[in-house]
Amino acid sequence: MAAMQWCGAMTRRIMMTQRTSAALNCSARYSSLSPACAAPAVSEMDLCGRGDKKTKKGKRFKGSYGNSRGKKQKMIERIKDKLELPRSTPWPLPFKLI
C-alpha cells in the first residue's frame, strides 16, 4: 500500500513539474491568451480515474458501458466463446464442462 502511495506521489510530482515547465515555455513564446498554450495543459489533466472514459472507474462515473466495463451477459458470452460452447448453454456452467 505504501508503495502505491509513493508511486502516486512521484507521478503527481513529475506531472506538476512538466506542467509548470510547459507553462513557462509557452508563456515565454506566446501570449497568455493563445489557444496553443492552453492545449497541452488540458490534455494532461485527463490521465486516469473518474475523468478518463477509457477506465472502469471513468465508465462508472459517466454511467456508460464499454470494453473496460462490460455488462454481465456480454462477459458470460465471451467466456463461453473462449470455451467454444454454444451460447445457449446455461450459466453457471455445469461442473463437468469446467
From Swiss-Prot:
Keywords for this protein: Mitochondrion, Ribonucleoprotein, Ribosomal protein, Transit peptide
Name used for this protein in its record: Small ribosomal subunit protein bTHXm
Family membership: Belongs to the bacterial ribosomal protein bTHX family.
UniProt transit peptide range: 1-35
Xref: Pfam families: RPS31
Origin: domain of life: Eukaryota
Chain spans, region Disordered: 52-71
PANTHER family named among the record's database cross-references: 30S RIBOSOMAL PROTEIN S31, CHLOROPLASTIC, SMALL RIBOSOMAL SUBUNIT PROTEIN BTHXM
One GO cellular component term noted in the UniProt record for this chain: ribonucleoprotein complex
Biased composition (Basic residues): 53-62
Subcellular location: Mitochondrion
Subunit structure: Component of the mitochondrial ribosome small subunit.
Species whose genome carries this gene: Arabidopsis thaliana
Ribosomal protein in keyword set: yes
